[in-house]
Protein backbone atom coordinates (compact mmCIF):
# COMPACT_ATOMS: atom_id res chain seq x y z
CA UNK A 1 0.00 0.00 0.00
CA UNK A 2 1.23 3.48 -0.78
CA UNK A 3 2.68 5.45 2.12
CA UNK A 4 0.50 8.53 1.69
CA UNK A 5 0.57 11.36 4.20
CA UNK A 6 -2.68 10.02 5.64
CA UNK A 7 -1.30 6.50 6.09
CA UNK A 8 1.90 7.81 7.66
CA UNK A 9 -0.03 10.13 10.01
CA UNK A 10 -2.36 7.37 11.18
CA UNK A 11 0.59 5.00 11.64
CA UNK A 12 2.40 7.60 13.75
CA UNK A 13 -0.72 8.19 15.84
CA UNK A 14 -1.22 4.49 16.62
CA UNK A 15 2.48 4.05 17.30
CA UNK A 16 2.64 6.95 19.76
CA UNK A 17 -0.41 5.67 21.66
CA UNK A 18 0.89 2.09 21.86
CA UNK A 19 4.46 3.15 22.58
CA UNK A 20 3.27 5.10 25.64
CA UNK A 21 1.27 2.08 26.83
CA UNK A 22 4.25 -0.23 26.34
CA UNK A 23 6.32 2.13 28.48
CA UNK A 24 3.64 2.13 31.21
CA UNK A 25 3.72 -1.67 31.19
CA UNK A 26 7.52 -1.88 31.41
CA UNK A 27 8.33 -3.26 27.95
CA UNK A 28 11.86 -2.84 26.62
CA UNK A 29 12.36 0.19 24.36
CA UNK A 30 13.34 -1.97 21.39
CA UNK A 31 9.84 -3.54 21.39
CA UNK A 32 8.33 -0.35 19.96
CA UNK A 33 11.04 -0.22 17.28
CA UNK A 34 10.34 -3.82 16.33
CA UNK A 35 6.60 -3.10 16.08
CA UNK A 36 7.00 -0.11 13.77
CA UNK A 37 9.49 -2.00 11.57
CA UNK A 38 7.09 -4.95 11.27
CA UNK A 39 4.14 -2.61 10.66
CA UNK A 40 5.99 -0.94 7.76
CA UNK A 41 6.75 -4.35 6.23
CA UNK A 42 3.08 -5.36 6.47
CA UNK A 43 1.91 -2.05 4.97
CA UNK A 44 4.35 -2.50 2.07
CA UNK A 45 2.74 -5.89 1.34
CA UNK A 46 -0.84 -4.71 1.96
CA UNK A 47 -3.13 -4.43 -1.03
CA UNK A 48 -4.22 -0.93 -1.96
CA UNK A 49 -7.62 0.29 -0.75
CA UNK A 50 -7.50 3.72 -2.38
CA UNK A 51 -8.88 6.73 -0.57
CA UNK A 52 -11.15 4.58 1.58
CA UNK A 53 -13.08 6.08 4.49
CA UNK A 54 -11.65 3.24 6.54
CA UNK A 55 -7.95 3.65 5.76
CA UNK A 56 -7.34 4.34 9.46
CA UNK A 57 -8.95 0.99 10.31
CA UNK A 58 -6.81 -0.77 7.70
CA UNK A 59 -3.69 0.80 9.20
CA UNK A 60 -4.95 -0.26 12.64
CA UNK A 61 -5.19 -3.82 11.37
CA UNK A 62 -1.62 -3.76 10.14
CA UNK A 63 -0.38 -2.23 13.37
CA UNK A 64 -2.22 -4.82 15.48
CA UNK A 65 -0.71 -7.65 13.44
CA UNK A 66 2.74 -6.10 13.98
CA UNK A 67 2.05 -5.76 17.71
CA UNK A 68 1.20 -9.45 17.88
CA UNK A 69 4.35 -10.44 16.01
CA UNK A 70 6.60 -8.27 18.16
CA UNK A 71 5.65 -8.47 21.84
CA UNK A 72 5.60 -12.20 22.55
CA UNK A 73 2.27 -11.72 24.33
CA UNK A 74 -1.14 -13.24 23.63
CA UNK A 75 -3.58 -11.65 21.20
CA UNK A 76 -5.83 -10.78 24.15
CA UNK A 77 -3.03 -9.00 26.00
CA UNK A 78 -2.01 -7.18 22.81
CA UNK A 79 -5.63 -6.10 22.35
CA UNK A 80 -5.58 -4.68 25.89
CA UNK A 81 -2.30 -2.85 25.20
CA UNK A 82 -3.75 -1.32 22.02
CA UNK A 83 -7.10 -0.47 23.62
CA UNK A 84 -5.58 1.04 26.75
CA UNK A 85 -3.07 3.04 24.72
CA UNK A 86 -5.85 4.52 22.60
CA UNK A 87 -8.11 5.20 25.57
CA UNK A 88 -5.27 7.06 27.33
CA UNK A 89 -4.76 9.29 24.27
CA UNK A 90 -6.38 12.73 24.44
CA UNK A 91 -6.09 13.02 20.67
CA UNK A 92 -8.04 9.77 20.24
CA UNK A 93 -10.96 11.19 22.22
CA UNK A 94 -10.94 14.39 20.15
CA UNK A 95 -10.89 12.46 16.87
CA UNK A 96 -13.70 10.13 17.92
CA UNK A 97 -16.10 13.00 18.59
CA UNK A 98 -19.45 12.33 20.17
CA UNK A 99 -22.75 10.71 19.20
CA UNK A 100 -24.27 14.00 18.04
CA UNK A 101 -21.48 14.66 15.55
CA UNK A 102 -21.50 11.03 14.42
CA UNK A 103 -25.25 10.98 13.85
CA UNK A 104 -25.42 14.42 12.21
CA UNK A 105 -28.01 14.13 9.39
CA UNK A 106 -25.73 16.21 7.14
CA UNK A 107 -23.34 13.25 7.02
CA UNK A 108 -25.88 10.73 5.75
CA UNK A 109 -25.68 11.59 2.01
CA UNK A 110 -21.89 11.09 2.02
CA UNK A 111 -22.28 7.80 3.87
CA UNK A 112 -24.85 6.60 1.33
CA UNK A 113 -22.49 7.55 -1.51
CA UNK A 114 -19.69 5.65 0.23
CA UNK A 115 -21.96 2.61 0.49
CA UNK A 116 -22.85 2.80 -3.19
CA UNK A 117 -19.20 3.20 -4.19
CA UNK A 118 -18.14 0.30 -1.98
CA UNK A 119 -20.32 -2.10 -3.98
CA UNK A 120 -18.26 -1.32 -7.09
CA UNK A 121 -15.37 -3.21 -5.44
CA UNK A 122 -12.73 -1.01 -7.01
CA UNK A 123 -10.12 -2.23 -4.51
CA UNK A 124 -9.92 -5.89 -3.55
CA UNK A 125 -9.22 -5.31 0.15
CA UNK A 126 -11.64 -2.45 0.76
CA UNK A 127 -14.86 -2.78 2.74
CA UNK A 128 -18.28 -3.36 1.16
CA UNK A 129 -21.07 -1.88 3.25
CA UNK A 130 -24.73 -0.92 3.29
CA UNK A 131 -25.84 2.08 5.34
CA UNK A 132 -29.11 1.34 7.10
CA UNK A 133 -31.56 4.01 8.23
CA UNK A 134 -32.35 4.12 11.92
CA UNK A 135 -35.25 2.23 13.45
CA UNK A 136 -36.53 1.37 16.94
CA UNK A 137 -33.32 -0.54 17.73
CA UNK A 138 -30.62 1.85 16.48
CA UNK A 139 -30.11 5.35 15.10
CA UNK A 140 -27.82 4.40 12.22
CA UNK A 141 -26.80 0.98 10.97
CA UNK A 142 -23.91 -0.45 9.02
CA UNK A 143 -24.20 -3.84 7.35
CA UNK A 144 -20.69 -4.90 6.36
CA UNK A 145 -20.58 -7.51 3.61
CA UNK A 146 -16.78 -7.50 3.32
CA UNK A 147 -14.19 -6.27 5.80
CA UNK A 148 -10.79 -4.87 4.86
CA UNK A 149 -9.26 -5.86 8.21
CA UNK A 150 -10.45 -9.46 7.75
CA UNK A 151 -8.91 -9.50 4.27
CA UNK A 152 -5.61 -8.05 5.52
CA UNK A 153 -5.44 -10.55 8.38
CA UNK A 154 -6.17 -13.38 5.93
CA UNK A 155 -3.45 -12.12 3.55
CA UNK A 156 -1.00 -12.05 6.47
CA UNK A 157 -1.90 -15.57 7.61
CA UNK A 158 -3.51 -14.53 10.90
CA UNK A 159 -7.30 -14.44 10.33
CA UNK A 160 -7.91 -15.05 14.05
CA UNK A 161 -6.67 -11.53 14.87
CA UNK A 162 -9.54 -9.82 13.02
CA UNK A 163 -11.96 -10.64 15.85
CA UNK A 164 -9.93 -8.52 18.26
CA UNK A 165 -10.10 -5.53 15.95
CA UNK A 166 -13.87 -5.87 15.63
CA UNK A 167 -13.95 -5.21 19.38
CA UNK A 168 -12.25 -1.84 18.72
CA UNK A 169 -15.13 -0.69 16.50
CA UNK A 170 -16.55 2.03 18.71
Predicted segments with their positions:
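Sequence termini and other peripheral, non-core segments
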Residues: 1-53, 57-74, 80
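C-terminal structured interaction module
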Residues: 163, 167-170
Amino acid sequence: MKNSIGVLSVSKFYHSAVKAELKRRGFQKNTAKKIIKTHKEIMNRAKEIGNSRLVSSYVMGSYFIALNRSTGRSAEENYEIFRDGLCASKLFHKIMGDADSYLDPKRIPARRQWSEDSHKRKYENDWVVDILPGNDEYDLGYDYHECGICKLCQDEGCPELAAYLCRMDY
